[in-house]
Amino acid sequence: MRIVVGMSGASGAIYGIRILEALQRIGVETDLVMSDSAKRTIAYETDYSISDLKGLATCVHDINDVGASIASGSFRHAGMIIAPCSIKTLSAVANSFNTNLLIRAADVALKERRKLVLMLRETPLHLGHLRLMTQATENGAVLLPPLPAFYHRPKTLDDIINQSVTKVLDQFDLDVDLFGRWTGNEERELAKSR
C-alpha cells in the first residue's frame, strides 16, 4: 500500500509527523509533500528537523514540482492525507486551484475517486469556512478535524494526538493500535465493580 501525505502550514504539524511514523511502522510506503509554511511550522512547533521527516517518508517531493509522480492520476496509490490542513489549503482543494504539488496531488486523488482525508486545523469557523468544507466534501474529500475524544481517558498529549491519528488511518482500514478503542459500557461497568 502507498499513501500520499501532505503537510500545510497550519498549526498541528505533529499530526502529519505521527501519521508518517505510524505508516512507516506498519510498512506502508509514503510520498511526502510539504509546503514552505509547513516547514516553518515544523521547526517552530516540534523538535523534528526536515531531515527527520524525509527519513520517515519513502519519497519526498518538492512543493513546486508539478511534474512529480503524485501529480498524475496514472500514479497508483490508496489515497492522500493532508495533516494538518490549513483553511488556505482547504480553499484551494475545494476549488481545484492547483497552484502547487500539494493541491494538485489532492485534486488528483479526488478526480481518481481515491480517498482524500483533510485534518482541518482552524477554530472558530465562519460561514465561508463551512461552505468550503461542504464543497470539499461534495467533491469527495473526508473532513476529519483532530477533535479529541475522552472515553479512552487520555493521560498525555500523545494520547490525544494518537487517537486522532488512528481515526485518520481508520479511513484506510489500517490498524495501528495507537490508543485503546471503545469496547462498550459493559467492560467499563465490570471494571468499576471490581
UniProtKB/Swiss-Prot annotation:
EC code(s) of this entry: 2.5.1.129
This protein's UniProt keywords: Flavoprotein, FMN, Prenyltransferase, Transferase
Transmembrane region(s): none
Catalytic activity line of the entry: dimethylallyl phosphate + FMNH2 = prenylated FMNH2 + phosphate
Top EC category: transferase
Binding residue positions for FMN: G9, A10, S11, S35, S86, I87, K88, T89, R121
Disulfide bonds: none
Function: Involved in the carboxylation of phenylphosphate.
Name the record gives this protein: Flavin prenyltransferase UbiX
